[in-house]
């Protein structure tokens, strides 16, 4: 009774296409893709900035411990 079959998924997909239309779904998909791409880019930028900051801290520590 609670199983999700291929037939049920196809019926739901057909209803979504009928309700929203292909143009709106295509636009929504493009917007979602752009949001995911922006999120991944921001995550990579944060990692790079954190690594660069750690390198600067390490260099400053080496300079301050110079005898």
UniProtKB/Swiss-Prot annotation:
GO BP field: intracellular protein transmembrane transport; protein transport by the Tat complex
Molecular function as annotated in GO: protein transmembrane transporter activity
PANTHER family named in the record: SEC-INDEPENDENT PROTEIN TRANSLOCASE PROTEIN TATA, SEC-INDEPENDENT PROTEIN TRANSLOCASE PROTEIN TATE
Gene giving rise to this polypeptide: tatE
Entry keywords, A to Z: Cell inner membrane, Cell membrane, Membrane, Protein transport, Translocation, Transmembrane, Transmembrane helix, Transport
Function: Part of the twin-arginine translocation (Tat) system that transports large folded proteins containing a characteristic twin-arginine motif in their signal peptide across membranes. TatE shares overlapping functions with TatA.
InterPro entries hit by this protein: TatA/B/E, TatA/E, TatE
Induction comment: Constitutively expressed.
Phenotype upon loss of function: Disruption of tatE affects the correct localization of multiple enzymes whose precursors bear twin arginine transfer peptides. Export is completely blocked when both tatA and tatE are inactivated.
Organism: Escherichia coli (strain K12)
UniProt name for this protein: Sec-independent protein translocase protein TatE
A GO cellular component entry from the record: plasma membrane
UniProt superkingdom: Bacteria
Lineage: Bacteria, Pseudomonadati, Pseudomonadota, Gammaproteobacteria, Enterobacterales
Signal peptide boundaries: none
Membrane topology reported for the UniProt record: Single-pass membrane protein
Family label: Belongs to the TatA/E family. TatE subfamily.
Matches recorded under Gene3D superfamilies: 1.20.5.3310
Location(s), subcellular: Cell inner membrane
A Pfam entry, by short name: TatA_B_E
Membrane-traversing stretches: 4-21
């Amino acid at each position: 009774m609670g199983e999700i079959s291929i037939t049920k998924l196809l019926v739901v997909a057909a209803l979504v296409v009928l309700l929203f239309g292909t143009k709106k779904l295509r636009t929504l998909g493009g917007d979602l893709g752009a949001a995911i791409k922006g999120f991944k880019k921001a995550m990579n930028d944060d990692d790079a900035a954190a690594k660069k900051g750690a390198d600067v801290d390490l260099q400053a520590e080496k300079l301050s411990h110079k005898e």
